[in-house]
């Protein structure tokens, strides 16, 4: 699947400290082990959209968080292999297409195209591999075959012989989320699972292959026509594009369970590994009007709508950066107004013919971003330099240009 064009990232003098991120499974901030050895790329797999609606600010905040990681790795001199999927066949997509009377493939392509436009406008660095689930059917089939052969999967008897993954197929299942069984069952039911499905060995067993139903898309396989389950798509794409030794598995915090837990379990089961990724990283939710922003609630603030109103994407980006990536937070007109004012001040300061020395502020921005992407402190450091430049001036003619390059390279905001 075609990705979008990445902006050029300026190279800065020097380097900052190694990146440290909060790991969901370990419940602590710790160093990110980027690359398995000398010359190895830093690897990251981030779950993409299900393309049945336009990109909202919750999506934007998630992909912005991982864009920051990408940028910190580049600043540290790493090659980066970033993979993102598109769940371009799934129940919500099929239901929306049926509701609107459109072909599900046309709906997916339309929304993916809009997503690309939004990501490019927000200056999100593109993944090296941008893969639709429908492009990875063969990879999914291979994984399901291996799980059936090992006994980690089974076929449910009945009119539709669906294939399920045994939740107890790996001893470590549950380590990523750390949730107890009661919480798992609740979230499983709320987030696409089917705990009441007759014939399952365990209510938590997850769908691997949905046998073909009338009127639904399906693909041939050795175990009958059908389509992939949600979690196995990501496991198959990550393993086929990156393989073992994934540095970061990431996405929104609403994906911790069941999606990321089962994606990791599928991969670990097939590869015989204790841990799918070295780091599990999750971004917080964005709210509006007192609630999490979601398609099901209908309280979306769409990136394309903001752009259509003439809001500059750099201001959207700065507004999202004003909060820490892991925290749930609310978007508001005030957040946007403050971001717009900040952008204006930064641009005024970096357009000056000279300013205060930039060495210290760039070092502090690097330090704050290396500390679990502490963007509020990074922005505050830049605000301090901006105030000094506007109020007191300076004599370093290279400083304004260098600060602008640092803001571009490290935060993705073009001044």
UniProtKB/Swiss-Prot annotation:
Protein name: L-cysteine:1D-myo-inositol 2-amino-2-deoxy-alpha-D-glucopyranoside ligase
Residues reported in the UniProt entry to bind L-cysteinyl-5'-AMP: 47-50, 62, 85-87, 230, 252-254, 286
GO biological process: cysteinyl-tRNA aminoacylation; mycothiol biosynthetic process
Residues the record lists as binding Zn(2+): 47, 234, 259
Gene Ontology MF terms in the entry: ATP binding; cysteine-glucosaminylinositol ligase activity; cysteine-tRNA ligase activity; zinc ion binding
CDD domains registered for this protein in UniProt: Anticodon_Ia_Cys_like, CysRS_core
Organism for this UniProt entry: Mycolicibacterium paratuberculosis (strain ATCC BAA-968 / K-10) (Mycobacterium paratuberculosis)
Pfam families linked: tRNA-synt_1e
Subunit relationships: Monomer.
The keyword Nucleotide-binding is annotated on this UniProt entry: yes
Superkingdom: Bacteria
Keyword entries, A-Z: ATP-binding, Ligase, Metal-binding, Nucleotide-binding, Zinc
Entry's cofactor comment: Binds 1 zinc ion per subunit.
Catalytic activity: 1D-myo-inositol 2-amino-2-deoxy-alpha-D-glucopyranoside + L-cysteine + ATP = 1D-myo-inositol 2-(L-cysteinylamino)-2-deoxy-alpha-D-glucopyranoside + AMP + diphosphate + H(+)
Gene: mshC
Placement of sequence motif 'ERGGDP' region: 190-195
Bridged cysteine pairs (disulfide): none
Cross-referenced NCBIfam families: mycothiol_MshC (TIGR03447)
HAMAP family, alphabetized: MshC
């Amino acid at each position: 699947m075609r990705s979008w064009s990445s902006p050029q990232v300026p190279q800065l003098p020097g380097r900052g400290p190694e990146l440290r991120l909060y790991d969901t499974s370990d419940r602590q901030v710790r160093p990110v082990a980027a690359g398995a050895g000398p010359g190895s790329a830093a690897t990251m797999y981030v779950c993409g959209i299900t393309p049945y609606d336009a990109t909202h600010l919750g999506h934007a905040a998630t992909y912005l968080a991982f864009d920051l990681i990408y940028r910190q790795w580049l600043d540290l001199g790493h090659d980066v292999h970033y993979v993102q999927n598109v769940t371009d066949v799934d129940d919500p997509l099929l239901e929306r297409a049926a509701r609107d009377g459109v072909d599900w493939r046309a709906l997916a392509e339309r929304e993916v195209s809009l997503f690309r436009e939004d990501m490019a406008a927000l200056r999100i660095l593109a993944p090296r591999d941008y893969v639709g689930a429908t492009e990875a059917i063969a990879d999914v089939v291979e994984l399901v075959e291996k799980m059936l052969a090992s006994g980690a999967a089974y076929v449910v008897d009945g009119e539709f012989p669906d294939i399920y993954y045994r939740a107890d197929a790996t001893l470590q299942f549950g380590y990523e989320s750390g949730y107890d069984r009661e919480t798992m069952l609740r979230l499983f039911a709320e987030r696409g699972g089917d705990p009441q499905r007759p014939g399952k060995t365990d209510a938590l067993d997850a769908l691997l292959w949905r046998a073909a139903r009338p009127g639904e898309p399906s693909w041939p396989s050795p175990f009958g026509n059908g389509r992939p389950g949600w979690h196995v798509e990501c496991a198959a794409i990550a393993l086929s594009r990156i393989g073992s030794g994934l540095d970061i598995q990431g996405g929104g915090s609403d994906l911790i369970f069941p999606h990321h837990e089962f994606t990791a379990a599928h991969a670990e089961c097939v590869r015989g590994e204790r841990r799918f990724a070295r780091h599990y990283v999750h971004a917080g939710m964005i709210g509006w009007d007192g609630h999490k922003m979601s398609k099901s609630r209908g309280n979306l603030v769409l990136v394309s709508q903001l752009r259509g109103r003439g809001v500059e994407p750099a201001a959207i980006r700065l507004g999202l950066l004003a909060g820490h990536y892991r925290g749930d937070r609310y978007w508001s007109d005030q957040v946007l107004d403050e971001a717009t004012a900040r952008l204006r001040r930064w641009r005024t300061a970096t357009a000056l013919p000279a300013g205060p020395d930039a060495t210290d502020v760039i070092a502090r921005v690097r330090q704050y971003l290396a500390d679990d992407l502490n963007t509020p402190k990074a922005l505050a450091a830049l605000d301090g330099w901006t105030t000094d430049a506007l109020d007191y001036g300076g004599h370093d003619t290279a400083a304004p240009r260098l600060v602008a390059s640092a803001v571009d390279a490290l935060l993705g905001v073009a001044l």
